[in-house]
């Protein structure tokens, strides 16, 4: 299945990309995608966004689909999903 991830705000700054498509195995979950993203980009992010020891995003980093947060890492992804990765923290 193919999923598009759009990076926003400071996450876009650290990732260096606006968006990217991922081909994932059928049955992949939100947790699978977040782990993939963290392993790929986590080294570019500060510790308040990615915890490299636990291989987890900080709770202030959220993934959203259709305007709703993806709750629970076991939530299934679907072919064609568009996921927004954003931080609840923003400067101003």
Named regions from a protein language model:
Residues 1-91:
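Ubiquitin-like/PB1-type beta-grasp interaction modules and other compact soluble beta-rich domains
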């Amino acid at each position: 299945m193919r999923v598009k991830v759009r990076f926003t705000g400071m996450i876009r700054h650290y990732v260096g990309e606006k968006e990217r498509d991922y081909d994932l195995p059928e049955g992949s979950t939100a947790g699978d995608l977040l782990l993939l993203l963290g392993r790929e980009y986590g080294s570019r992010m500060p510790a308040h966004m990615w915890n490299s020891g636990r291989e987890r995003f900080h709770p202030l980093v959220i993934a959203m689909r259709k305007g709703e947060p993806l709750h629970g890492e076991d939530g299934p992804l679907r072919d064609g999903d568009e996921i927004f990765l954003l931080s609840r923290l923003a400067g101003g």
